[in-house]
């Protein structure tokens, strides 16, 4: 079923240059936009003197790193070849032969989307939709199987749930304590509240 769904999506490639370009853009560049949004939330926290924004941005980066480490561990245990290794596919974005499972692009974008939920619910919804398009694009361009993307989302939803339930408030409080000490020591107190 994984291969059938892969073929269904990947066979859409190389039929329309505009759609191919959009999928390549989502696959290659949208993850950087997600990172930039997180940095912007942090900068807004400085400019508007809102510690909560800085905490949210830090917490989002923290859970994203945790999820990427989980991916690294899974990839080192379960190597899954990319679709183009054993089959002829419509490969729009060349990639090395590193393990395909789970998708780092899907993991990173969904981690950021869910992490920024406390900042702005509408932004979270928009970024979640964009993350799903990123995941779809990874299959469309020939770099991932659908299961790589779907299971990446499952991992992110599970870790985010646990993180929000047990760790998020502790991480944000620790950030606040460290920030206050650093800003006092570095005399940047005027930049913060």
Task: Label the model's feature ranges.
Residues 1-96, 111-117, 122-134:
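Hydrophobic alpha-helical bundle signature of multipass membrane enzymes
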Residues 94-193:
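Membrane-embedded catalytic cores of phosphoryl/pyrophosphoryl-handling enzymes
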